[in-house]
Amino acid sequence: MNKMKTLFITLLCMGAGTLSAQTADSTQTSPWTKEGFAGLKLTQVSLTNWAAGGDNSVAFDLQGTYQINYKKGKHLWNNRIELAYGLNKTGDDGTRKANDKIYLNTNYGYAIAKSWYASAFATFQTQFSPGYDYSVNKDVAISEFMAPAYLTTGLGFTYDPGKIFTVVLSPAAWRGTFVLNDRLSDEVAYG
């Protein structure tokens, strides 16, 4: 019985060491890091015989973020996508958009000093669905997918000391606003 325990513990330790070694090797050889998260928030407020007043409401908010980054030698390349969409219904009002975002970012850098990179970046931002100004006219959209859309590009420097934070300094940048809806473009709503 004692020999069985010793054999079992020995095999268990060897297996754990092998698994640990495999994990360490795979993370050390890849210059790519990937991470992301997704979240869903649901809320409801129901008021019955509530003396202080208020409105019943129900809402949801769906969000996701994903990053894939490359860092090897003198090269740094960070990429990020953020998507979010949420709706809210309060009282007798119809369902309204509470959150709406499509955001893409890429930043490439070449090392010029410790933690400093000469860099170029591009950012794109728009939304999924139409938006409305409910105080004016709740039936006429004031924004929609690609109306507006923003593209920002720039040259500058990236400071990346590690995993805690990154700072991008861009003294030379350009921002373009695209409105792919003729009515919104004719109203000069976005520049």
PLM-predicted stretches and their roles:
Residues 28-44, 75-77:
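Transmembrane beta-strand segments of Gram-negative outer membrane beta-barrel proteins
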Residues 56-62, 98-102, 147-151:
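Residues that define the transmembrane beta-barrel architecture of outer-membrane proteins
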Residues 40-46, 72-74, 83-89, 124-130, ...:
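Transmembrane beta-strands of outer-membrane beta-barrel pores
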Residues 170, 174-191:
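Outer-membrane beta-barrel transmembrane domain signature
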Residues 36, 40-42, 62-70, 104-110, ...:
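Residues on the lipid-exposed face of transmembrane beta-strands in outer-membrane beta-barrel proteins
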Residues 1-26:
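Bacterial Sec-dependent N-terminal signal peptides
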Residues 49-54, 89-94, 137-143, 189-191:
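Extracellular loop and loop/strand-boundary signature of outer-membrane beta-barrel proteins
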Residues 74-77, 115-118, 164-167:
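Repeated loop/turn-to-beta-strand initiation elements of outer-membrane beta-barrel proteins
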